[in-house]
Amino acid sequence: MSLQAIVYEDNKLSVLDQLLLPHEHKYIPIKSVEDAYSVIKNMQVRGAPAIAIVAALAVAVSLVNVKTDDLRNYVIESFERLKQSRPTAVNLFQIAYKMRKLAEAYEGEEIRVVVVKEAEDLLARDLRDNHTIGELGSEYVLKLVNKPRLTILTHCNTGSLATSGYGTALGIIRSLNEKGAIERVYCTETRPNNQGSRLTAYELLYDNIASTLITDSTAASIMPKIDAVIVGCDRVARNGDTANKIGTLSLAILAKHFNVPFIVAGPSFSIDMTLPDGEQTKIEERPSRELVMVRGPVVRDFTTHQFGARESVHIAPINVKAYCPVFDVTPADLISAVVTEKAVFTKGPNGYEFKW
């Protein structure tokens, strides 16, 4: 059974605090829109699909007990607030738009019913879509590379912790592993928040998938033995330009140089057809402390872990200026394919054409 980042049952919602992983499991109850805003903003929950799901379910949970004569305005204002938490991940904006349309189309108590149903459907749909992405992607990669066992490189975290379960890019890797087609998976540490070392490495170990953790800067030296690079996406523009975790662009350039397929995986929800290209993507910047500090359990004499004692350590000069973008944009011409639950999209004479 995969890790569960989002727990929703009987109108109660909680999320796994991913800032404490991999050493501590703690679920945070989400009882209000502000609770959801906080965990998304603080990256206690992250991953474009998971952000949208938590936002939608938080509004649904709050609707159960909210007392207001204007449910329509409550829903619209709630999603406007949640949209401010993370500006790059398109999934949140897509579900906010859909919920606005539902709120505008119904009256009174009907609004409460349809919004809750859509939030619950989103949770179930995401899990189904992830399994489809995994199957379509694994079939595509095996046919493209034409080897029985593959060595894969992935970046950031795109698994159960970033979605409702199974994952997108990591879903493809899971599907390959289920087919006995994984030789080894290399995952980058993914600075500055180390989602690769804290989360992806943890998921791979949890599923007993042969894996090795590397620093971000090691990628060039191992790229010649990589069969495919598989990453997720936070926003894909109409032309295929893809915003994803910072460092994705570097991997795409390396993959191009070494003639390694570079594959993007994500739900069709992540494709923003209103965005012509990646130049229009708003890139979120995080506080400099996320770059100049690290946090984790105390280790005595390099051997004894004190898991109950978590400390922050400053690893850079105190007054250094730090630039800490969360995402970069990979041009479409560096991407071999975009795998969604609808289809595997590859470039044609006119580039990427997303139609379903």
From Swiss-Prot:
Superkingdom per UniProt: Eukaryota
Pathway entry: Amino-acid biosynthesis; L-methionine biosynthesis via salvage pathway; L-methionine from S-methyl-5-thio-alpha-D-ribose 1-phosphate: step 1/6
Subcellular location: Cytoplasm; Nucleus
Active site residues per record: 234
Site positions for Transition state stabilizer: 156
Record field: catalytic activity: 5-(methylsulfanyl)-alpha-D-ribose 1-phosphate = 5-(methylsulfanyl)-D-ribulose 1-phosphate
Protein task: Catalyzes the interconversion of methylthioribose-1-phosphate (MTR-1-P) into methylthioribulose-1-phosphate (MTRu-1-P).
Protein's name according to its UniProt entry: Methylthioribose-1-phosphate isomerase
Source organism of the structure: Schizosaccharomyces japonicus (strain yFS275 / FY16936) (Fission yeast)
